[in-house]
Regions:
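Metal-assisted phosphate- and nucleotidyl-transfer catalytic regions
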Residues: 1, 230-301
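Auxiliary tRNA-acceptor-end handling modules of aminoacyl-tRNA synthetases
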Residues: 1-183, 188, 192, 204, ...
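Active-site lining segments that contact anionic ligands and/or coordinate catalytic metals
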Residues: 9, 29-31, 132, 142-144, ...
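Generic secondary-structure signature for well-ordered alpha-helical cores
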Residues: 57, 207, 220-227, 265, ...
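Conserved alpha/beta enzyme-core scaffolds, especially Rossmann-like or related mixed alpha/beta domains
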Residues: 64-88, 193-254, 279
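Hydrophobic alpha-helical membrane-association signature
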Residues: 94, 214-218, 260
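A translation/RNA-centric and nucleic-acid-associated enzymatic feature enriched
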Residues: 137, 143-144, 153-162, 171, ...
Length: 314
């Protein structure tokens, strides 16, 4: 019933029909969204149907419930997972291993509050670029705060809290803490897209001359950890660069971007990462190396990232 033969070469699989607000704005009219996939032959369609059955059995939400690892509550809200005692053990053990590897590569653990004054994110540029993704909190006296969507602005303030000498560099901080993003409700699901997620974040403050070695250090850290997890040989790397036709989307000078992109290319070549150049995939403040790993169904999932940022320190 879900497959209709349009002609001798095209087959369609209807996946779902749902209502959605136009442009994601609840004040707009609700329209119907139809999601499907087309195939050139019956064999490809049959393979896809088998994939869907396999995906349903391997769905982490189903496995998480069966193994009693996490749950959700309508009272708590969607996109806000609750880890059970068993799930918390798994989560804590992973966190301990990540912190152990980070210390091995010279990172010092820090701890920052979940809230920050809105001015911090106005200065960093996040308030302008990600305005719709910020959870804003007003104090009884009307003072505006933000639940942190990233950790980097906080870490810059630890670095800036006292005078530093170039002899102290590089200085490496790491933190394991919650980050908050106001995702579109229709996009929230399971543990893959949530409002609050624990992120292991590391930042290295260094001179320009030290940047390349710091990137290499972080890439080796990633290889170390994911090798321990048995995942390293099933991945590929994206050299995520800017969209050259829309420079207004990014912070920083063209010269700095050119330097950063070339440096990441050199690191990829030297470490044998064979990074694939992906235009338009950079963050607003710099290019990056995105490490893509395969899940149990062969889908690419971005997990760790090495990000260069010349803009925020300024």
């Amino acid at each position: 019933k879900e497959m209709k033969k349009l002609n001798k070469n095209i087959y369609v699989k209807l996946l779902r029909v749902s209502g959605v607000y136009f442009e994601g704005n609840a004040n707009n009219e609700m329209i119907t969204r139809i999601v499907g996939k087309s195939f050139e032959n019956q064999e490809d369609l049959d393979k896809y149907n088998e994939f869907l059955i396999d995906a349903k059995e391997r769905d982490h939400r189903k496995i998480g419930q069966e193994l009693d690892l996490f749950c959700f509550s309508d009272y708590v809200g969607p996109g806000l997972p609750l880890y059970t005692p068993r799930g918390t053990i798994v989560k804590d053990e992973l966190q301990k291993e990540i912190e152990r590897v980070c210390r091995k590569y010279g990172f010092q653990k820090v701890s920052c509050p979940s809230l920050a004054d809105i001015s911090l994110f106005e200065t960093s540029g996040h308030a302008m670029k990600f305005n719709d993704e910020l959870f804003r909190v007003n104090s009884p006296k009307g003072h505006e705060f933000v639940l942190k969507p990233v950790q980097c602005p906080h870490h810059t303030q630890i670095y800036a809290s006292k005078l530093r000498s170039y002899k102290d560099l590089p200085i490496r901080y790491m933190e394991s803490d919650k980050q908050y993003r106001a995702e579109l409700q229709g996009a929230v699901g399971g543990l893959s897209r949530v409002y609050a997620i624990t992120v292991e974040d590391g930042h290295s403050f260094c001179t320009r001359e030290q940047v390349k070695q710091e990137v290499i250090n972080m890439c080796n850290l990633i290889k170390d950890f994911y090798s321990n997890m048995g995942l390293w040989n099933d991945h590929w790397v994206s050299l995520s660069v800017r969209d050259y036709e829309h420079p207004e989307k990014y912070i920083g000078s063209k010269e700095d971007w050119d330097i950063c992109e070339q440096m990441l290319k050199e690191v990829s070549d030297e470490l044998g990462l064979n990074a694939k150049r992906c235009e338009g995939e950079a963050a607003l403040y710099g290019p990056k190396l995105d490490f893509m790993f395969k899940d149990a169904l062969g889908r690419d999932i971005q997990i760790p990232t090495v990000q260069l940022d010349f803009a925020m320190p300024k």
